[in-house]
């Protein structure tokens, strides 16, 4: 079963890469009314940190704020509600590689697509090769935000972060 899931994720990764490569302009402008924007509080009981393969829970309640910023998004992450931001960066929804300001001096880039009012996709590249995919989605009622991320080298090791709207 794990092999099927891993194979499926590889197929999805390849398909997403092809779609994005063929349609760099694909996407939508950021609109403040889009349901994906807001302040989101992690539901630790429904979130799984599996990058190490151990299906661990997150030790603290993360807070993520997604806000429209020009023709893109400002993405801010706090490791707990009382902590200072772990990171905060702005990104354009143009599907192009831009330097990753979270790690100055590294050969790391981020590309973002706003595929629908409730979907954002992020591709991270390190040394020119895709090192992470992230898909952000919001439920149809706008109350639940989910972040699913994985590294192409181990697609079966996914982080699933589930958040509820805080504002």
Where are these regions (language model features)?
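Positively charged n-region of N-terminal signal peptides that target proteins for export
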Residues: 1-4
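Generic secretory/membrane-interface signal
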Residues: 6-11, 28
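Bacterial N-terminal signal peptides
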Residues: 9-19
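Cleavable N-terminal signal peptides
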Residues: 19, 24-25
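Hydrophobic small-molecule pocket/channel-lining residues, especially in calycin-type beta-barrels
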Residues: 26-167
């Amino acid at each position: 079963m794990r092999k099927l899931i891993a194979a499926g994720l590889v197929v999805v990764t390849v398909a997403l890469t092809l779609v994005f490569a063929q349609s760099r302009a694909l996407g939508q402008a950021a609109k403040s009314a889009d349901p994906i924007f807001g302040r989101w509080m992690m539901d630790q009981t429904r979130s799984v940190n599996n990058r190490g393969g151990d299906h661990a829970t997150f030790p603290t309640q993360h807070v993520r704020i997604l806000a429209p910023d020009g023709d893109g998004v400002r993405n801010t992450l706090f490791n707990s509600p009382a902590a200072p931001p772990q990171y905060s960066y702005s990104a354009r929804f143009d599907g192009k590689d831009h330097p990753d300001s979270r790690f100055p001096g590294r050969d790391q880039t981020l590309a973002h697509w706003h595929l629908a009012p409730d979907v954002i996709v992020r591709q991270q590249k390190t040394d020119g090769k895709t090192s992470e995919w992230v898909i952000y989605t919001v439920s149809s009622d706008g109350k639940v935000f989910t972040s699913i991320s994985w590294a192409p080298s181990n697609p079966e090791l996914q982080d699933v972060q589930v958040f509820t709207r805080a504002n």
